[in-house]
């Protein structure tokens, strides 16, 4: 789905409208197939009550519009209540979590996760004396690893608000829209 979105965006920039239409049709079919295969109507989710299982269908557009508010509410409850402001994602889920929450303006949730100092969190790594990012939240494997660096993008695009303008590819136009969150002072 993500690759089809990229192809569609490239086709759009190049003015290849027929290719955009083909991508739209394939995207609609793929999203519907994934939704049908994985959405549990009884539970109102895509598998289990973990953050990546909420974020991926939201980010990929798999969740129909009617389901999106409830999924986002469940994700928020999972972050704030079940996990007490912590992530329960791995390296891939963390990247997509940061990207989607920034894109929908939920920088408050990202900020909450950033400000945790207990396990599992970046703050926990710092509390344990880390000077680099670890491969695993518990510090078991590599202590100089890039797998949890995905949130650095949030510092630029979310917190500082430096964003590309989709209507003007190649940074021909830049959007500056900083997030006002928590106790951050400028």
What is each of the regions a protein language model found here?
Residues 12, 19, 42-43, 82, ...:
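Residue-level detector of alpha-helix boundaries and kinks
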């Amino acid at each position: 789905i993500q690759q089809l979105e990229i192809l569609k965006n490239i086709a759009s920039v190049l003015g290849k409208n027929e290719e955009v239409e083909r991508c739209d049709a394939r995207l609609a079919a793929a999203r519907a197939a994934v939704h049908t295969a994985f959405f549990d109507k009884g539970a109102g989710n895509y598998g289990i009550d973990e953050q990546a299982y909420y974020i991926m269908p939201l980010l990929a557009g798999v969740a129909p519009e009617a389901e999106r508010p409830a999924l986002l509410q469940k994700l928020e409850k999972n972050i704030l209540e079940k996990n007490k402001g912590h992530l329960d994602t791995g390296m891939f889920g963390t990247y997509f979590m940061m990207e989607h929450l920034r894109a929908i303006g939920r920088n408050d949730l990202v900020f909450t996760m950033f400000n945790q100092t207990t396990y599992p969190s970046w703050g926990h790594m710092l509390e344990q004396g880390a000077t680099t990012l670890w491969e695993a939240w518990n510090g078991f494997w590599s202590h100089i690893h890039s797998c949890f660096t995905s949130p650095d993008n949030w510092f630029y695009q979310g917190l500082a608000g430096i964003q590309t303008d989709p209507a003007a590819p190649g940074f021909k136009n830049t959007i500056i829209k900083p997030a006002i969150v928590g106790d951050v002072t400028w």
